[in-house]
């Protein structure tokens, strides 16, 4: 089989697609020939600029606040209404509270907010995305973005780590559950990535020094270095891969 990351004719939905890893995914999926719908929360200018950059046709942005309260079903429906089907679901959105928060001072509000955005919304998107894929009867691909924190924990960020560990367990269970439907379910687990979400932390010299000490490759990832394996997992070349946790973190998960 010739090696080609060709997704012509496929319809992809990418969450958190206006910036960072999500925007890199949108670009790569369009370059591979897929039609792409992505959501943004507040960054409308960035979303509009990305659609314009990619030529408009075959790329569509939707404002949606993903927290498990109903926008997820509407977002899946918007993708299907726009392009007629759903073949690929990339769940990239999420929050990482940037300030260290000891468990004894963490508020219930912070805990619930992190779980709502990082976990409840993932459940809802998978639920409605899988229902659509089953109706179509032609299989599909789901890739969830987790984190090194989901595998080894993260001190002072137990809310975030709990959600990222939970989605890893979801991926493992769903990969078996959905295999008969030819719906592949995998996970990509980044560590530190140079994005808007991490910029304030990575710009602090002492904090950056400590972070780089636990990344064997000695630097944070570029968004494109996370998007590339996500793209691969949604192609025919990954046709015997499901239920896997792809550690794309410069080796950080091994030494943290």
Label the model's feature ranges.
Residues 147:
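Residue(s) in the substrate-gating loop at a strand-loop-helix junction
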Residues 99-103, 107-115, 211:
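Substrate-binding pocket helix/loop in short-chain dehydrogenase/reductase
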Residues 11, 18-19:
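Conserved glycine-rich cofactor-binding loop
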